[in-house]
């Protein structure tokens, strides 16, 4: 993270869910394909999928701040809403289990743009 961005986050509570920087891999095959099309670019992939909690993913970056706020407020339960295959819901449940918070998921089986919406409620422990 650039120093100016780090400074902006300095006063915000955060719990460490990542354990250090995730690796960058150079996408040489994609670079070569683009070069054949006249685009000369260095392309790197940030491998947040290698974070060891709940299958990893970038959602853990925001959850570091959300969960720190929950803990700082003295709360013991998290409720979240999302689609049946929501990465946010999956990772929220994994983080709650890791830090000892109760978690309730409200999951939709259809797009929220169509009615009726069928929901499933899950309690994670």
Regions found by a protein language model. Give the residues of each.
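PLP-dependent amino-acid enzyme catalytic core
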Residues: 1-125
